């Protein structure tokens, strides 16, 4: 009888031991699963701003809505155009400007017909082309810059096209330093301001002027005069003295990097020698540089909206942003 009771107690204890062992294992498994789930969820939340899993891939439709609280937006299209084309408001205007007080809402609504969701179109104005070097930040997933083309600003357009279509690393130049030199073909000096008059004197290895006198600024060679923006190229690996009106112009030493593939340039031309190969109506255009021959700004925007797919397909959304202070470190 005693043995039977002892056996019964042992069996019960074994059953309890096995149950507790299994229960503890299940408890630990459940606890571990919860901890791992919480860690993964937090990591995804922390890295959401820099991960590219939610990046758009434009194929005729933008897939996600812009987050207006995020200044570095990876799901939007920014369009930059001169603020001078926003004319006096009122019906019946024939000057060709954007005279509709609701022009921004109208343009955004028309982009919606092409698949862009509400809130994904950002219209921004600029005062002068040199603003893109000095103050304009381009941080959208796609950026389109519209620049009027005329014989009087053709040089500035070429320079700003070079600037916005490529990535640059820049540092401010201190002209109190005696000489500067450029180290390669991708090394240029960016001059920008209200009036940039820049002249240089190249020096030989003995620091004597080559075709000029370092002590006489009147003998310096003029590289830029009465311009708002200039990308200055001098002979590489040759020291130069620089003369510039620092009150109305700034100078940066810049190194050209890779192409900025999320940015395109549209030049507005009224020239009779218009090059049709640059029109967005030409499907062969792949250089991210277009021309539209028109005088009326509603015609210009209608053309951009209608051919936005052609323009977007020359671009890549995931790319560096542009900041005026120099090297573009952050990716869209």
Curated annotation (Swiss-Prot):
N-glycosylated. Intramolecular disulfide bonds. Glycans are attached at residues 67, 225. One of its GO terms (cellular component) is T=13 icosahedral viral capsid. Keywords: Calcium, Capsid protein, Disulfide bond, Glycoprotein, Host endoplasmic reticulum, Host-virus interaction, Metal-binding, Outer capsid protein, Signal, T=13 icosahedral capsid protein, Virion. The keyword Glycoprotein applies. It is found in: Virion; Host endoplasmic reticulum lumen. Pfam families: VP7. One of its GO terms (molecular function) is metal ion binding. Residues 1-33 form the signal peptide. InterPro entries: VP7, VP7_1, VP7_2. Its main location: virion. Belongs to the rotavirus VP7 family. Homotrimer; disulfide-linked. 2 Ca(2+) ions bound at each subunit interface in the trimer hold the trimer together. Interacts with the intermediate capsid protein VP6. Interacts with the outer capsid protein VP5*. Calcium-binding protein that interacts with rotavirus cell receptors once the initial attachment by VP4 has been achieved. Rotavirus attachment and entry into the host cell probably involves multiple sequential contacts between the outer capsid proteins VP4 and VP7, and the cell receptors. Following entry into the host cell, low intracellular or intravesicular Ca(2+) concentration probably causes the calcium-stabilized VP7 trimers to dissociate from the virion. This step is probably necessary for the membrane-disrupting entry step and the release of VP4, which is locked onto the virion by VP7. This is Outer capsid glycoprotein VP7. It comes from Rotavirus C (strain RVC/Pig/United States/Cowden/1980).
